[in-house]
């Protein structure tokens, strides 16, 4: 894992107990409850730390997730749609988060706007199955990716703040 601040944030996210994916019907319902509880706690912790940076919701089955994330850079808010599907082999396989608006704008992204998490995040996820869930995916996957990629894309002029585009 990264620095002490990241460790502290992750230590405050409840770990999950149910090792179940979408194919596991009844157990999947239990896993989804744990996922929601973990996400709610993570969002509450972020709000209390004045670090609120995403919203997520899912379809009724809990297999397709979508929402928004945002990144503040030079006091400007950059907002992006996010989406991902729960793999059939979840939780053994981590979901792949897509930021469709950024598709093709960075080398650290796969076709379809899926962010690259293979080097750092996926080995960590694999060591922590089934304890890690979607809150951990956001905290250790998307969050650090945004922190590295968005300032770089802004500096290179690849993305611009919406207000600057309208002027």
Swiss-Prot record:
Highest taxon above the source species: Eukaryota
Effect of residue 50 to A: Decreased ribosome ufmylation
GO CC terms, sorted: extracellular exosome
Active site: 116
Single Gene Ontology MF annotation: UFM1 conjugating enzyme activity
PTM text: Ufmylated at Lys-122. Deufmylated by UFSP1.
Keyword annotations of the record: Disease variant, Isopeptide bond, Ubl conjugation, Ubl conjugation pathway
Ubl conjugation among keywords: yes
Outcome of substituting residue 110 to A: Decreased UFM1 transfer
BP term (GO), one: regulation of type II interferon production
Outcome, altering residue 30 to A: Does not affect neither UBA5-binding nor thioester formation with UFM1
Effect on the protein upon substituting residue 116 to S: Instead of the formation of an intermediate complex with a thiol ester bond between UFC1 (E2-like enzyme) and UFM1 (substrate), a stable complex with an O-ester bond is formed
Covalent cross-link Glycyl lysine isopeptide (Lys-Gly) (interchain with G-Cter in UFM1) as placed by the record, residue numbers: 122
Pfam families named in the record: UFC1 (PF08694)
Keyword Ubl conjugation: yes
Effect ascribed to mutating residue 32 to R: Abolished interaction with UFL1
Quaternary structure note: Interacts with UBA5 (via C-terminus). Interacts with UFL1. Interacts with UFM1. Interacts with KIRREL3.
Chain's role: E2-like enzyme which specifically catalyzes the second step in ufmylation. Accepts the ubiquitin-like modifier UFM1 from the E1 enzyme UBA5 and forms an intermediate with UFM1 via a thioester linkage. Ufmylation is involved in various processes, such as ribosome recycling, response to DNA damage, interferon response or reticulophagy (also called ER-phagy).
Family: Belongs to the ubiquitin-conjugating enzyme family. UFC1 subfamily.
Illness: Neurodevelopmental disorder with spasticity and poor growth: An autosomal recessive disorder apparent soon after birth or in early infancy. NEDSG is characterized by axial hypotonia, delayed psychomotor development, poor feeding, failure to thrive, peripheral spasticity with hyperreflexia, poor overall growth, and microcephaly in most patients. Additional variable features include contractures, facial dysmorphisms, and ocular movement abnormalities.
Domain notes: In absence of UBA5, the active site is solvated by water molecules thereby reducing its nucleophilic activity. A linker region of UBA5 is required to reduce the amount of water molecules in the vicinity of the active site and elevate its nucleophilic activity.
Protein name: Ubiquitin-fold modifier-conjugating enzyme 1
């Amino acid at each position: 894992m990264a620095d002490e601040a990241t460790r502290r944030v992750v230590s405050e996210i409840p770990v999950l107990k149910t090792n179940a994916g979408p194919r596991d019907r009844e157990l999947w319902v239990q896993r989804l409850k744990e996922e929601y509880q973990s996400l709610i706690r993570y969002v509450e912790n972020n709000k209390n730390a004045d670090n609120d940076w995403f919203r997520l919701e899912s379809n009724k089955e809990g297999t397709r997730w979508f929402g928004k994330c945002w990144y503040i850079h030079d006091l400007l808010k950059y907002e992006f749609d996010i989406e991902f599907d729960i793999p059939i082999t979840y939780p053994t396989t981590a979901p792949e988060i897509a930021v469709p608006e950024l598709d093709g704008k960075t080398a650290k992204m796969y076709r379809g706007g899926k962010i690259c998490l293979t080097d750092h995040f996926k080995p960590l996820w694999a060591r922590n199955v089934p304890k890690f869930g979607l809150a951990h995916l956001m905290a250790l996957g998307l969050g650090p990716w945004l922190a590295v990629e968005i300032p770089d894309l802004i500096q290179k002029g690849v993305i611009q703040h919406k207000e600057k585009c309208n002027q």
